[in-house]
Amino acid sequence: MAKQPGYQARSTNSGKGELKSRLLFVLGALIVYRIGSFIPVPGIDAAVLAQLVEQQKGTIIDMFNMFSGGALSRASILALGIMPYISASIVIQLLATVSPALAELKKEGAAGQRKISKYTRYATVVFATIQAVAISTGLPNMLSGLVPNVGFSFYFTSVVSLVTGTMFLMWLGEQITERGIGNGISILVFGGIVAGLPSAILQTIEQARQGQMHPLVLLLIAAIVFAVTYFVVFVERGQRRIRVEYAKRQQGRQILGGHSTHLPLKVNMANVMPAIFASSIILFPATLTQWFGQNDKFEWLNNLSMLLNPGQPLYLLVYAVAIIFFSFFYTAMQYNPRDTADNLKKSGAFIPGIRPGEQTSRYIDKVMTRLTLIGGLYVTFVCLVPYIMTSAWDVKFYFGGTSLLIVVVVIMDFIVQVQSHLMSSQYESALKKANLKGFGQ
């Protein structure tokens, strides 16, 4: 009995030790990611490429560079970022809704998920190869001196380097999910965006200092950033609580049940994924048209890429529709109203005024549909903020919308994950303490 306090302390410390190791792993992975973004692709003049990216400010290439954490402007092997993997994941998930074979794999549990993950990796290689070929063939035509020695050797090494970099990031993201905290892919996207924040802030302040931007405009931008951040936090914490009651039942001489609780449904159940998915889906064809369009034979692609530049009406329309679509798609992939209704029925719970079973499922689905529409419109509104700002004040993408939403939501999710790990370790410690007391008695 005297050993119980010491045992509890060791249990708590072991739980905190695991959390510490997971946090250190995430930090280490982000450091590796950052170091990798400085490893150059052979054959490209990085200084000339940085000049080119600066000239492309406000275009799809600028946005592509933002998501890669500036790796594109440094001609890094990680220039493609994690976007090819995200695009591949979207395609495989979409195919799973129409392909009976993939649909069956989803029902096979862990074994089926491993096969789907394998197909996603294969698709990632395909998407990364297509984008790498587009970049390697488009770069020599964009600026003189960018690629000093154009030839098969350059094309081969650049494509292999870029595809290898993407596959490494895919593996790193999976390791963060498994051995770290949170969703590894979201954290890598977050890391890429945050890496460019300091330079973007300093650049904007420098614009104001040199008189290119009125100080009041700078203050207004800061106020908008804080207002959007507050709005994002407010909505992300918002819930629609459905009242649930438990029927009274007799077990021996005891009356169990008879109490009520709530079924919480988030306003934005899809989280930040619609914004990431929509950006990935637009970036893939838009960058292809941008790179391939540098060839005189495909000049029409260059004209199309101009229409797909951020802030253009076509881009805004496609982006808004994609966000709404992926809000419904991702919510449907992650949450099943029928399963929730069945679980309530099995536990003896019901929604007042709604019959258990099919009617409960339809009611939850109706509520989720309304919430998803509200969540999709909210994400669309937040993501369109930067384009209004850039067109009015020539501010970089980092200051609003997609990037701000991703940063805030990933931080919030990360904090929740850390808290759940702490609560889990405390819960395990309490259980072990109770078991020791029972053993002592």
From Swiss-Prot:
Compartments where found: Cell inner membrane
Full protein name: Protein translocase subunit SecY
Pfam family, one: SecY
Organism: Haemophilus influenzae (strain ATCC 51907 / DSM 11121 / KW20 / Rd)
Function in brief: The central subunit of the protein translocation channel SecYEG. Consists of two halves formed by TMs 1-5 and 6-10. These two domains form a lateral gate at the front which open onto the bilayer between TMs 2 and 7, and are clamped together by SecE at the back. The channel is closed by both a pore ring composed of hydrophobic SecY resides and a short helix (helix 2A) on the extracellular side of the membrane which forms a plug. The plug probably moves laterally to allow the channel to open. The ring and the pore may move independently.
Membrane topology according to the record: Multi-pass membrane protein
SUPFAM superfamilies tied to this protein: Preprotein translocase SecY subunit
Membrane-crossing segments per the record: 24-44, 77-97, 123-143, 152-172, 181-201, 215-235, 272-292, 313-333, 373-393, 397-417
rRNA-binding found in the keyword field: no
Keyword Transferase: no
Protein family membership: Belongs to the SecY/SEC61-alpha family.
